[in-house]
Amino acid sequence: MAVETLRGGRDGGIASGVNDTSPVALPLPDPADVARRKKIMGVVFLTLFLDLLGFGVILPVQPFYAESFGASATVVTLIGASYSLMQFICAPLWGRLSDRVGRRPVILVSIAFACVGWLILGFAQALWMFVASRLIAGFGNANLGTVQAVVADVTAPKDRAKGMGMVGAAFGLGFLFGPIIGGVFGSRYGAHVPALIAAGLAALNWFAAYFLLPESHPAEKRTAAVVVDGHGPRRSIFPLQALKEALAMPSVAPLLVMGLVFGVGFSLMEAALSLFVERQFVLPPAFGTDAGHKEAAYLSMLVLVTVGVAAVIVQGGLIRPLRARFGERSLLLAGAILVAVGFAGTAALPFLSLPFAAMLALNVVVAAGSGVFSPSSSSLLSRSVPDDRQGAILGVGQSVASLARIIGPSMAGALLELHRSIPFALGAALLLVAAVLTRKVRDPEHV
């Protein structure tokens, strides 16, 4: 494999103490290696797209599916928190395991679990089956950190934000087309049908990954399962210990704290969105009926599609030039402020009697803010650790995001029952706190 840069330390610079200033010819990239990296990125995009397409399919109908089993708004959002609880527990496990055995087997096993979870959801006959399906799917879908580690494996640090932007674009496309499929089939044939479609997409995803995805993390770079040569700390796969280890790293801790605050605020919106739409825009006598649920699912689909379009535009095409011009720290600040503005506007809707189009416009602002914040945060996080810890640290990052999605939804339902604006108002306040915390973040290239 050709060497693209001269390496003299973690930052890739030439070792200090070398006084020879004569020009040095850098080896040209190996065309075969470049082609391999592009292939891996393409397969990762396909895998993520199918994964998020399946997840997006269920989004418009999931709250109303749970309500059909007698769940209240508080229970609906707690079920969402249980899904994130499994991701919090399992994301470091998947990430650390991928550092030890490779990315490919971890991705294949996790997709298989997700498929089983979606199947149980599709055939659920009681609320306990609904909850069990979300726990199993959460266990399987805790693999985002591993997928991000694949991106980190095959991209140079200077291109990391672009690679993470591709991850975001796959998210956007999944959230664009998934809710359309879920909204159409759910409104016609019932809420269980989108779950079965999600199971089929997970099965297709498994076969695509099995036949197309090569290993990106070679054996010589893998972390041993035991302490190397009897020295150094043992790296835990358990979330609290792994999080403790990550928080001890000065370059990582500010990113994780900021990400937690951002995630709690954002997840308040995610958990409350469909129920807010139902209470704000579905009027009596349809409200609370099957027809009202279908109308709310359709309107929620429109919001999610709008978010998906905006996310694809920002993360698929704008993130690289924005990073080059403003830098990732500036994008973190701008992203948090944009999301806060969108949330504050949404919280004001019940008091302003604005039409549904205002809800769509505000979510474009939210998607734009999240679209620059998330890939910038992931890029900074991945560049803050050595190559052999990419999977572990990105798994911890996903675990922190999952912890946020436990805290936020656990409050969202109860807050929404007090008043539908409260989750969005609190979310806006937390996003402003996250904006302030961006001042503590340091770019590894400039430390």
Describe every region a protein language model picked out.
Residues S330-S377:
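C-terminal transmembrane helical hairpin of 12-TM major facilitator-type secondary transporters
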Residues A91-V101, I313-E328, L416:
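Helix-to-loop junctions at the C-terminal end of transmembrane segments
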Residues P105-I120, A199, S330-G345:
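Structural signature of the two symmetry-related core transmembrane helices
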Residues S133-G172:
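Cytoplasmic helix-loop-helix junction between adjacent transmembrane helices
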Residues V167-F211:
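Helix-loop-helix hairpin linking two adjacent transmembrane segments in secondary transporters
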Residues G70, G102, F123-W128, L349-S353:
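Helix-breaking motifs and short loop linkers at transmembrane-helix boundaries and internal kinks
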Residues F88-Q125:
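Conserved MFS/SLC helix-loop-helix module at the cytosolic interface between two early adjacent transmembrane helices
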Residues P23-R37, S216-L256:
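Juxtamembrane intracellular "pre-TM" segments in multi-pass secondary transporters
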